[in-house]
């Protein structure tokens, strides 16, 4: 089975966290993320996808050191037209300032209130939010 890797950023606002960003697909909400290109690093991929999908630049956000959430699952890949084993890597990023979100690849976006536990999508979104909550509590 083909192995693929995608990377993205869980974007949060304020300290302490007040809200987090999700992008609207046709039938679901998701994090800004995408596939690794060439020989880029995971962080380079995550930052590139964040810029492409939201307009958030590297200067707008701080990736919090020590947070790197990973999950793996099988997916029917539209990109490759076959079932693939996907590794997803998510970084936690805190905005440094207010920014205008420009959803270039999605229908819309929304800032969801930070009110754990979250019930959005069990496989990835809820799990990464729970891990981010634990990380933020222990790294105040």
Please place each PLM-identified region on the residue numbering.
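Conserved Nudix-box catalytic region and its N-terminal flanking loop in Nudix hydrolases
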Residues: 16-57
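Short aromatic/basic micro-patch
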Residues: 30, 85, 111
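Active-site beta-strand termini and strand-to-loop segments that position acidic
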Residues: 11-15, 25, 93-95
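Short connector loops at helix/strand junctions that flank enzyme active sites
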Residues: 4-6, 26, 83-88
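Active-site segment of metal-dependent pyrophosphate-handling enzymes
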Residues: 56-98
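Conserved N-terminal beta-strand and adjoining loop/helix that marks the start
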Residues: 1-19
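NUDIX/MutT-family hydrolases
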Residues: 90-94, 99-132
